[in-house]
């Protein structure tokens, strides 16, 4: 039974909004994150762990520690197959459908199979779209792909719907870590209008007002990383 995905789908159907905090294993240090995790807002429903260039060891240490501090589901958000660890509860198996680099469309997934076969992780196929957040993101740099401009709404919408038609279970609109501009309400609303699977939105959300706008536009789950890490979220 896919417990994590099932819970997200059920929440989406009743318009219950979800919130994930994203932790980058490369920035992780137990002495700093112990207090951080214990003081997470009650609204947080999931913890995502991942970064663009983290190692397996870094991911394992990070996930291990987090699971001693919280009962929230810990989900891998990997930038590379090396970040996969069986210590987590699940994994967003990301396909970067906004780009055309085969390495991040299918090749990383093939390389990950030996690890995933026996990891016992709940695997959630996810269509991942990188949108322009006003600065160069680590995702764009590492994947060697260009983000879609946020005014290309039809392209964004059709790419997301194509992902759903291909069988992805979630669609993730990403403005990039530390984005100057979050995913716009117009983009979220247009994508959500015909999407029959849950929608995740992340990147550049720094305050409760932006969070509420993303929810109102149609985001089912919002991901906040940099703003929580730096204590900037208000």
Swiss-Prot record:
The keyword Iron does not apply. Signal peptide: none annotated. It is an enzyme of class 2 (transferase). Keywords: Lipid biosynthesis, Lipid metabolism, Magnesium, Metal-binding, Phospholipid biosynthesis, Phospholipid metabolism, Transferase. The keyword Plastid does not apply. Its cofactor is Mg(2+). One of its GO terms (cellular component) is cytoplasm. Prenyltransferase that catalyzes the transfer of the geranylgeranyl moiety of geranylgeranyl diphosphate (GGPP) to the C3 hydroxyl of sn-glycerol-1-phosphate (G1P). Homodimer. Belongs to the GGGP/HepGP synthase family. Group II subfamily. NCBIfam families: GGGP, GGGP-family, PRK04169.1-2. This is Geranylgeranylglyceryl phosphate synthase.
């Amino acid at each position: 039974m896919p417990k994590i995905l099932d819970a997200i789908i059920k929440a989406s159907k009743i318009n219950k909004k979800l919130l994930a905090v994203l932790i980058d294993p490369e920035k992780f240090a137990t002495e700093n994150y112990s207090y951080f995790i214990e003081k997470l807002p009650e609204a947080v429903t999931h913890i995502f762990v991942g970064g663009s260039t983290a190692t397996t060891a870094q991911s394992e240490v990070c996930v291990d520690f987090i699971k001693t501090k919280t009962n929230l589901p810990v989900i891998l958000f990997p930038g590379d197959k090396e970040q996969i660890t069986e210590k987590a509860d699940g994994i967003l198996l990301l396909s970067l459908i906004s780009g055309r680099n085969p390495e991040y469309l299918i090749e990383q997934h093939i390389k990950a199979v030996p690890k995933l076969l026996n990891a016992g992780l709940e695997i959630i196929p996810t269509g991942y779209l990188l949108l322009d957040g006003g600065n160069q993101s680590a995702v764009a740099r590492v994947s060697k792909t260009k983000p879609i401009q946020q005014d290309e709404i039809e392209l964004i919408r059709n790419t997301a719907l194509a992902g759903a038609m291909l069988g992805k279970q979630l669609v993730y609109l990403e403005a990039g870590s530390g984005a100057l501009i979050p995913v716009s309400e117009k983009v979220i609303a247009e994508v959500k209008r015909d999407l029959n699977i849950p929608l995740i939105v992340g990147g550049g959300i720094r305050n409760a007002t932006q969070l509420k706008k993303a929810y109102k536009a149609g985001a089912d789950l919002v991901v906040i990383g940099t703003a929580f890490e730096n204590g900037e979220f208000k």
